[in-house]
Amino acid sequence: MPILFIILFLLVIWAAFLGKAGEGYSNLLLNFDLKQLTNPTNIRLAFSQAFFSLSLGIGVMITYASYLNKKSNLPKQAIQISFLDTLVGLMAGLITFPIIYTFNMSSSISESTIGTLFTTIPTGLGQYGLIGRVMAILFFGLAYIAAITSMVSLLEIPVSTLIDKFNLKRKYASIYSFLIIFA
């Protein structure tokens, strides 16, 4: 989704010029404390995020790896995927925290920041009329497409199992898996 990445990049630049961007960066995002790297809660949360965002707990990466050819450089690809996943998360923070401080939204953040991006982006972009609304629609539309296409990968595990165990064609294995999961 290069277009979504480009929109994220543009939003990072836009957020950097908001009135209280520096305050948002220094207070919430770039306030680095080395002691927190040894905090067991933070370590658990970091692993939880990695397992969630890379779908490691349900075997998606293992299933994808089974389709790679023998010459694939797995360590290099793992580093690239991890880097891009971290970069997108950092970009989301670089967008979210300036909006929180500029538009006084600190009270809307709970202990869990899940969904914060989805409340701050509309608020921040809503202040900029039609252009802001168009950017919000593009962002959320592309985020929706990215989420749906990522969900398709979750079907690959039962589909590949049905193909391997019962020698089904991919089309029928996909239909059966879809019906069992979503019916």
Can you say where each PLM-predicted feature lies in the sequence?
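Membrane-embedded translocation segments of transport machinery
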Residues: 2-148, 152, 166, 172-173, ...
